[in-house]
């Protein structure tokens, strides 16, 4: 992780750049070897009608539909299975959980509809939740800020494209199963590629003073999940095509705003709340198919919230959380999600007509709380401290002239201090291989062949 909170703003010399140049700079901060940590498909948002398609083949148990019980098992599994993880064996443990998860999914598919299949589905959901915990850990601790943004965006785009696909190629009641199968396939493949060395920097990590930064990000993450969970229990949109297409428009708007606003996530958070508030109000004021159709256009803002929430969560976890605290974070935010399954689920069963009103009040209430927390969140998450030292400014100007990425700039700072690769890795919370990769790139861009030449180049200035 970088020393600074995040690259929410550009360097002064970059502010006049075009959108194309900004997108190009993002590309240079992506490392192909990290794709396995970027694809958090086990945490992908659900699409309208997915839940209904799964319920169609579900066998109720204890008076509840199996999908409701599987949702509870999923939330429990995220924190429960990761609680036994240790840094020494985390990659091997993740592979084993992924293997058992895949087997249980296949078992759930082949068993005839009945109590046994429902039980297999609950076991699968528990293990799938465990995989989500590992994927969130890799997402937060092995990636830089840009990779997290792109990873969350790809995961959201996966959901939107699948939604458009089933709108154009109807799969009937099987669309939910196929979506879950794709999640399982990608997640299992990514988890089998995890490498323990990418998490070595967590071992001796200090977490002093983490609370002020962690709390606002956890609030926004929980708020996003609460709003989306309530909306998922409303009757589905009459047009998946319109919902999917509008979601793609919002997705494109999300990325453009992020880049045009100089890499600030703040605007995405505000637009998520505003968009979802409008969505619930439309469902409340127009309780018919026309209201559902109108709401499906603005419902795409939920994807903006997904990207922003996981970006911020990954940011604060990667910088301020060690393994022990990460387990507590999982227990708090995902086990608390049990209420987000139970409350709207029971409400949908006992008083479905009250769901739009309760969802609207919940969204507006969380929006008000978010507004009240703006000063704290602005100070802790959205403002990068100004650089004051002249030597620092000179270093940044040279890095800009040579076209260094943010990570390469950080590695160079460590190298010219005389640090070894191992010390650089500990300082930046990345692996030694990653340090070597960025150091060689910096040598090439600066047209030097050794650390001595690099030090002379910067220190002479």
Protein language model regions, located:
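Linker/hinge segments immediately adjacent to helix-turn-helix/homeobox DNA-binding domains
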Residues: 3, 13, 41-53, 105-106, ...
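Cytoplasmic helix-loop-helix junction between adjacent transmembrane helices
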Residues: 128-152
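The N-cap/first-turn positions of alpha helices
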Residues: 406-411
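Recognition helix of helix-turn-helix DNA-binding domains
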Residues: 418-453
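Hydrophobic core of transmembrane alpha-helices in multi-pass small-molecule transporters
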Residues: 116-133, 291-306
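Glycine-rich segments within core transmembrane alpha-helices of 12-TM secondary carriers
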Residues: 146-168, 327-344
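Central cavity-lining transmembrane alpha-helices of secondary-active solute carriers
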Residues: 65-85, 248-256
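Conserved MFS/SLC helix-loop-helix module at the cytosolic interface between two early adjacent transmembrane helices
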Residues: 80-96
């Amino acid at each position: 992780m970088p020393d600074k909170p995040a690259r929410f703003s550009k360097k002064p010399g970059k502010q006049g750049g075009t959108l194309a140049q900004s997108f190009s700079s993002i590309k240079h901060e992506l490392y192909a070897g990290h794709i396995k940590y970027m694809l958090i498909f086990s945490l992908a948002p659900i699409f309208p009608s997915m839940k209904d398609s799964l319920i169609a083949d579900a066998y109720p148990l204890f008076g509840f539909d199996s999908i409701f019980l599987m949702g509870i098992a999923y939330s429990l599994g995220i924190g429960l299975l990761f609680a036994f993880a240790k840094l020494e064996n985390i990659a091997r443990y993740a592979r084993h959980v992924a293997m058992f998860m895949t087997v249980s999914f296949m078992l759930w598919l082949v068993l005839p509809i009945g109590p046994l299949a429902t039980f297999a589905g609950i076991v699968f959901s528990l293990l799938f939740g465990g995989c989500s915990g590992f994927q969130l850990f890799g997402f937060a601790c092995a990636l830089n800020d840009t990779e997290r943004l792109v990873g969350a965006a790809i995961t959201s785009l996966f959901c939107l494209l699948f939604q458009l696909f089933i709108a154009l190629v109807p799969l009937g009641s099987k669309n939910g199963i196929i979506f879950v199968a794709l999640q399982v396939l990608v997640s299992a493949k990514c988890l089998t590629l995890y490498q323990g060395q990418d998490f070595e920097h967590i071992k001796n990590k200090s977490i002093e003073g983490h609370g002020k930064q962690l709390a606002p990000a956890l609030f926004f993450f929980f708020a996003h999940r609460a709003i989306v969970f309530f909306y998922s229990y409303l009757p589905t949109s009459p047009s998946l095509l319109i919902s999917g297409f509008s979601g793609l428009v919002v997705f494109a708007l999300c990325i453009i705003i992020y880049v045009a606003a100089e890499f600030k996530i703040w605007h995405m958070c505000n637009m998520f709340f505003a968009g979802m508030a409008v969505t619930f109000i439309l469902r409340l004021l127009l309780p018919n198919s026309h209201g559902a159709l109108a709401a499906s256009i603005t419902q795409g803002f939920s994807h903006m919230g997904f990207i922003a929430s996981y970006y911020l969560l990954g940011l604060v976890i990667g910088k301020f959380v060690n393994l022990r605290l990460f387990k507590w974070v999982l227990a708090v935010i995902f086990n608390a999600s049990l209420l987000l399954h139970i409350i709207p689920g029971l409400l949908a069963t006992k008083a479905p007509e009250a769901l739009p009103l309760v969802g609207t009040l919940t969204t507006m209430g969380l929006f008000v709380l978010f507004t009240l927390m703006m000063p704290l969140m602005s100070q802790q998450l959205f403002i990068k401290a100004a650089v004051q030292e002249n030597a620092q400014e000179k270093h940044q100007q040279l890095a800009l002239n040579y076209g260094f990425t943010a990570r390469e700039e950080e590695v160079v700072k460590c190298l010219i201090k005389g640090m070894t690769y191992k010390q650089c890795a500990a300082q930046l919370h990345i692996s030694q291989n990653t340090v070597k990769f960025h150091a060689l790139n910096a040598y090439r861009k600066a047209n030097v062949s050794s650390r001595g030449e690099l030090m002379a180049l910067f220190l002479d200035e």
